[in-house]
Regions:
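Membrane-interface helix-loop-helix junctions at boundaries between adjacent transmembrane segments
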Residues: 76, 80, 97-178
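Predominantly late transmembrane helices and immediately cytosolic-facing juxtamembrane segments
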Residues: 127-131, 236-259
Length: 333
């Protein structure tokens, strides 16, 4: 535990517990296959959890909004302005080109770029936390593990969403989705070996479990997708990633409020540890709901894309080392 008793820590055991969604997903698949004759798959479960109104309200965009609210402090914006401003212009041009360029090619290219950035962001977060909980620096083995996971994740992502956004894909006369499945299988096989080697070298027990949890997340996603349960493939990483992100943002806001000064979101609210726990998710969900309600309008749709790209971008550096934000977040191993 950090020596400052006023500092709240993100509990690594809680983050590891989120991965229980993996065995629970296999239990659902087993029950549906062996007992219910796939009634859930063919009759009750949608292909995408976003078809559930409550899920669409709580997951996806809200954690991106929460990240923006946490970063929108005046001191942080002043500190990072020369990294954020040029990037925002570049990503705005990417969004406009994808939205208004020659169709369907422009939107398909935008999808591939978005898919790659999404997978890179999600896995960089989860694998980075594995590194923190392991108490080690990123070496050659970790980098191999990370990129095997990213390539596996990208292939799985294209298998899940490609039909919706790309349509039929043929590569050198070969069905593209069969090729994606082959690539995902090969990278998952490599991931098993790399995960075993990385976990073996880890001295921290919690870090070792977290390394295995992340390796198994991708392997499980590939296996469950091959069984046809697309909903669970989307649900597992989304639930883990979003709840992990909210845990970090709430911890940051609480510690900053208690130790230094409250951000603009909390300035007129009671100064106690529970305020960010309630206010940040509530404000994020409300703003995300408003944006999603009007996303059919080009301006709102582009705004959602832009803030998503910017979220992926700034999350790559604002929590590294002893950055201004990272000073308010510690992990308990």
């Amino acid at each position: 535990v950090h020596p400052d008793s006023s500092l709240h820590c993100v509990d690594g055991r809680w983050l590891l517990a989120l991965y229980c969604v993996i065995p629970l997903s296999f239990i659902v698949v087993a029950l549906d296959t062996l007992v219910l004759q796939r009634t859930l798959l063919h009759g009750l479960l949608p292909d995408d959890p976003n078809d559930w109104a409550l899920w669409a309200l709580l997951f996806g965009l809200p954690h991106i909004i929460a990240s923006a609210l946490t970063l929108s402090d005046r001191d942080y914006l002043r500190h990072y302005r020369w990294r954020l401003l040029p990037a925002s212009l570049v990503f705005l041009l990417v969004c406009l080109a994808g939205w208004y360029g020659p169709q369907p090619l422009s939107y398909q290219l935008l999808f591939v770029f978005f898919a790659g950035f999404t997978v890179f962001h999600v896995l960089s977060q989860q694998l980075g936390i594995a590194l923190v909980l392991s108490g080690r620096r990123p070496g050659r083995l970790f980098r191999l593990w990370k990129w095997a996971a990213i390539f596996a994740g990208m292939a799985i992502y294209l298998m899940v969403y490609g039909g919706q956004y790309l349509g039929r894909v043929q590569l050198a006369g070969i069905d593209g989705y069969r090729l994606f499945a082959l690539l995902a299988g090969c990278f998952c096989a490599a991931l098993i070996l790399l995960t075993w080697q990385l976990a073996r070298d880890c001295e921290e027990r919690l870090g070792r479990w977290f390394i295995w949890a992340n390796g198994l997340l991708l392997i499980s996603a590939f296996a469950i997708n091959e069984l046809g349960y697309t909903l669970l493939v989307i649900l597992m990483p989304r639930l883990i990633h979003d709840l992990t992100a909210f845990s970090v943002y709430i911890t940051h806001d609480r510690n900053r409020q208690v130790r230094t000064s409250a951000g603009w979101l909390y300035r007129w609210l009671p100064s106690n540890g529970m305020t960010p726990f309630v206010v940040l998710p509530a404000a994020s969900i409300l703003i995300a709901w408003l944006l999603n309600s009007y996303q059919q309008h080009a301006f709102i749709g582009i705004a959602i894309l832009l803030i998503s790209f910017m979220h992926y971008y700034w999350e790559g550096f604002v929590w590294r080392g002893e950055s201004p934000l990272r000073q308010h977040v510690r992990f308990r191993r």
